[in-house]
Structure formats: structure tokens, C-alpha cells
């Protein structure tokens, strides 16, 4: 097994072992409970990333062969913070990013703007923030807004597409295809798929 990469098509079965070998520092210790203690009642440190959040940042860092990930965590597990940490790490390698943040409109201010202000690195904050392009995929004009913002984005930068509540977005795509009514989500989906095929550096995070 290579220390830097693994071919999942050839060695998919040993992927868990490869992860354990190459990311040892992120292995969680066994939970040892004392009688009468409830780990759910332990105070949570809110100003520090959890081990699993930090792991994802390392797994998707700029030099990683892996560029896409479905962050399949439960509600309240910190998926938003996880994505912001990934962006912090990528930006530290190069500031040339287009972060296309596809979200329901109701999540724009909370959690996204709230967590960006809290978790995004403060150095070069304005430049980091300028790279973030918000698209509300539940807008009646989502496809038009998306294509316009893609067209206006700096083509010399690498794109990272982040889809919040990805299951909801994919359900919209399915409804577009099956009902043959409306194409908002399908247009966005097809564009991202095509860009991914044409540019191997394009990244996708599904939350």
C-alpha cells in the first residue's frame, strides 16, 4: 500500500486498512465509562474541532489524491464547521478557489453566515469570504442564478462545489427527471457532473 494514495478501483477492499495506517493520529480512543457516568452529559468544547472534523480536513487537503466526499454525519455533528475547516486548509495552500455553496435559502444566515464568521480563519478573512459564492437551490430561479454566477466566477481558480442537505438536492433532481416538469436542480446537477469530467481538480463535498 502506498503511503500517499490508493487505487480504489483495484484495492477498494483494503481501503479501511489504508486509512487506519495513514491516519493513525485520528483514531478515536475506546470510550471507558465509569459507573454512573453518562458521556452525553459531558460538556462540549465549542471552540475546537473534533477529531473526526480535523480528520476530514487532512483527508481532503490540497495534496490529497481524494477530492470528493459525502460527509454522512448526523444532525448537529458539525458538518458546516467541517466544510469550513476543509476550505481553511485548502486556502492555506492557495487562495485561488471558487467555493460554490449550494444551500436552501433558509440556511443562509444560520448556520452558514454564522459559522463562517466563527470558524473561518481570520487572516485574509475578506479575501477568503470573497471566494464563497452562495446559490439557493430551492429558489425558483436557481438554475439561472447558478449559471450566471458560474459564468462570472474567475475561471483561473479551482472550483469546490458544496451541497448542503444533499439528499434534498438529489431528490429535487430525481423529481425533475421523473416528472419531466422543471429542470432547476437537473441543470445544476448536469453542469457539476460535466465540469467534474472535464476538470479532474474540481472538488465536491456533499453534506
What do these predicted ranges mean?
Residues 2-58, 62-70, 74-196:
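SF2 helicase/translocase NTPase motor core
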Residues 99, 203-206:
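Hydrophobic/aliphatic anchor position in the core parallel beta-sheet
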Residues 197-203:
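A short helix->loop->beta-strand "cap" motif at the edges of active sites that frequently abuts
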Amino acid at each position: 500500500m502506498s503511503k500517499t494514495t490508493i487505487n480504489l478501483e483495484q484495492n477498494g477492499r483494503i481501503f479501511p486498512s489504508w486509512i487506519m495506517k495513514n491516519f493513525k493520529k485520528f483514531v478515536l480512543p475506546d470510550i471507558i465509562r465509569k459507573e454512573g457516568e453518562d458521556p452525553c452529559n459531558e460538556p462540549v468544547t465549542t471552540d475546537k474541532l473534533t477529531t473526526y472534523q480535523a480528520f476530514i480536513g487532512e483527508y481532503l487537503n490540497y495534496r490529497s489524491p481524494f477530492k470528493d466526499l459525502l460527509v454522512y454525519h448526523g444532525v448537529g455533528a458539525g458538518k458546516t464547521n467541517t466544510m469550513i475547516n476543509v476550505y481553511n486548509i485548502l486556502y492555506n495552500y492557495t487562495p485561488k478557489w471558487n467555493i460554490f455553496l449550494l444551500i436552501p435559502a433558509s440556511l443562509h444566515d444560520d448556520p452558514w453566515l454564522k459559522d463562517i464568521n466563527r470558524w473561518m480563519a481570520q487572516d485574509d478573512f475578506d479575501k477568503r469570504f470573497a471566494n464563497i459564492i452562495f446559490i439557493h437551490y430551492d429558489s425558483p430561479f436557481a438554475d439561472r442564478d447558478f449559471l450566471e454566477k458560474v459564468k462570472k466566477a474567475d475561471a483561473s481558480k479551482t472550483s469546490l462545489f458544496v451541497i448542503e442537505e444533499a439528499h434534498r438536492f438529489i431528490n429535487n433532481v430525481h423529481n425533475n427527471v421523473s416528472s419531466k416538469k422543471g429542470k432547476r436542480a437537473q441543470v445544476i446537477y448536469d453542469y457539476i457532473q460535466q465540469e467534474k469530467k472535464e476538470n479532474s481538480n474540481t472538488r465536491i463535498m456533499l453534506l
